[in-house]
Amino acid sequence: MNIPTSLVQTLAVQSQLNLPGTAGRLLKQIRDLENVAPRFVEAGLVLTVDRPASLDTRLSGISTRFTTAKLAGGFLFVCAAVRMDLRFDRNALATEGTDSASVIDDIDFLDQSKRLQLIEVRQAYEMADHAMKMEAPPRILLIEGPLVLNRSMVPLGKASQHAKEYERAVETIRAFWKQHESKLFPWNPAGTVVAGIATERLGAIAAISQQDLRTIEGQQQLLKCDLPKAEILGDINRQRSSISGIGEKRFVRGILGTNSRTAAFKMDVQTPRMEPADLVDDQGVVGFHYRSSVLAEPLLVQLLGNDASWTRQQLNELAGVLIAATVQREGYAVPVPFQLAQQQLHSLKNFLDQYCLTMRRELKNREVEDSWLSDLES
C-alpha cells in the first residue's frame, strides 16, 4: 500500500539515502585527481606560467549581453555590446576609452535564443572592427565568446529570421579577419592577438569543441610546440580508467593549479564545418585552458592558428597576461575589461522594463496609430 507523502518528506528521505554515496563518489574523484594531477605536470600536459612581474600592455575586452521582456503575446529584446580599452603601465591600470552598440526590437518566441546569441556575436565583432580602425589598436583584443561558429548555431529553416542573422554573423566574422589581416596575428607576427574567452555566462553560446586530454585521441591533437613527454604520457594512459568518469569541467579544474595552463590543442579537427569555413580551413583554430588562482575557475581561450602559427613562448606570454589581468570578483574571475564592460551592461534589464512600460502606454493610447491616420486624412 502506497502511503501519500509530501515533497518535503520525499526529499528528506532521498537526501539521507543518497548523501553517503554521493559524498563518497566525489571524495574518490578528488583523490584520483590529486594522485594524477602531478603526472600531468610532469608530462607537460599542464604548464606553469610565469606571471609578468610588471604588466605593460594595451588590452581591450568586449562583453555582450541580451535581455527580453514579454509584450503583447511576444517579446521585446535589447542586445548590447561594450568594449573597454585599458592600458597597463607597470601594473598601473588606466582606462583609455570605451565603445558600445545596441539593438532594440521585437522577436518571436521560437526565434529567441539562438538568434539573440548570433546578434551578440555579430555585435562583438563590430566592436572589434572599431578597435582595429583606431590609430593605435590594442596589443591584445579579448572577445567574451567564440571567435568562430560551430554547427550548433546553424539554423534549421532557410527563411527564418534566425537564418538571416546566422548569415549576417558569419559574414561579419569573415569580413573582420579579411579586412584587418595585415594588422592581426598570425598573419602579422607583431600584430594584435584576438582571443575568444568562454566565460561561464557564455558557455552555451560558445559551444566550443574541446579536446579531452585524458584520451589518446585528444592527446594526438596537441600543438607540436606543446607535445608531452611520451614515457610519462604512457603511465597516465594506463591510469586513465580511474579518471575517465570525471566530468570535463571538474577534470580541468582538478589538474590546473595557480598560474597554469593546459597544453594547447587543435579545436577544429573534431568539429568540421566551423564557420566561416574558408577562414577555419586556412588558419585553423586552437585553444587552451588557464587558471589564475585556486579560487578561480579555469577559462577556455580560443585562438586562430595552427602548428606553424604559435610557439610555446608565445602561448605562455599570452597566458601570463591573461592571468595577470584576471581578477576575482563576486564569486567569479574574468579579465578586468569584461568586468568593467559588464558594469555597464547591468543596466539593460532596467532599461528594457522602462521601455516596455512606454511601449504598453503607446499601444494603449494608440498615439502612434493616430499620427499615421492623421497624415492620411490630411
Give the role of each language-model region.
Residues 1-52, 57, 121-378:
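Long, contiguous domain-sized segments
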Residues 30-35, 108-115:
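Short, basic, glycine/proline-bearing loop/turn elements
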Residues 57-67:
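Two-metal-ion RNase H-like nuclease active-site motif
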Residues 66-107:
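Acidic, metal-ligating active-site segments
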Residues 118:
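Metallocofactor- and cofactor-centric catalytic cores in central/energy metabolism, strongly enriched
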